[in-house]
Amino acid sequence: NEPARWGKPFAALLGALDAQLELSAAAIGGKDSMSGSFLDRDVPPTLISFAIAPLLEGELLTTDLKAVGHGVYLFAGKTPEQQTAAWERFTALARAGKVVSAWAVENGLAEAVMKMSSGNEIGFAAENTVLDWFAPMPGAIVAELSDEVSDAVRIGVTTAEKAIALGADSASIE
């Protein structure tokens, strides 16, 4: 009897459907609490979705940087259409075997390259200081590529120095 409570998970469901349609990907299941109750308990409005992406052996990417001297690129867009185009470029490069590692950006590029660098203690030097390195970028991907490409934004390069360098600032990853 509370439309606002029903509206929250329903809006989340519509948002999830929109994301699936935009990315041409499907969720395989989920759970909702549309009614806000379970037996005699009050339950907050909730929507949980899960999905899998079946891959062939060799198609799986990890997040840790792999080698010194590789370019690191940003795949992102400001509009849904640009985001979809960036995802398609990234996917084509991954299927061609050119993506060595990748990270789904959450809390900014600085966090992404710091976490990617920690796995194999490979450093990173930023080459693009125009970007806001600390701004959230939902839907963006940072990728280490084995070859140079012209259809993505190059943000830096992997280095032998065990540090993340953003302009004059540097942070050790040791």
Question: Can you annotate each of these PLM segments?
Answer:
Residues 5-47, 93-174:
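Glycine-/charge-enriched secondary-structure boundary and capping motifs
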Residues 66, 74-102:
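A glycine- and small/hydrophobic-rich beta-loop-beta segment
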Residues 3-6, 84:
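Conserved strand-to-helix beginnings and helix N-cap segments that scaffold or border functional pockets
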Residues 41-46, 56-74:
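Acidic/histidine-enriched ion/cofactor-binding microenvironments in catalytic or ligand-binding pockets
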Residues 50-57, 76-87, 106, 127-128:
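A general structural motif
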Residues 1, 20-23, 28-31, 50-56, ...:
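Glycine-rich anion/phosphate-binding loop at the beta-strand->alpha-helix junction
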